[in-house]
């Protein structure tokens, strides 16, 4: 499957860095956080970063922003959904529940966790959902 559209949930240091990396590869990204303002600030940080995170400043146009309450429906069109939220398993499980209700069949779902084992992350997923789930730590 060719990845044409990515949603990154969590716009902190890791989430915004992942979004920038995808932009450099010309992959459209939607960056979601609790509030749109948080995602907008992350987009600004990417644009103004020193050293630059973007190969070409115009690539910033590949990043759309939103929030998980009003804009979560973008998950339906994503080929890859990256979870990059705080390292709290309860929050991650809540996000996965929402993702797996919305995502299209076959869309990849990954966590950017650095410390939580995949067995713990996926303990509430069905066998079918587990086939599309992985850890992608950047």
Regions found by a protein language model. Name each.
Residues 1-48, 102:
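NAD(P)+-binding Rossmann beta1-loop-alpha1 motif at the extreme N-terminus of oxidoreductases
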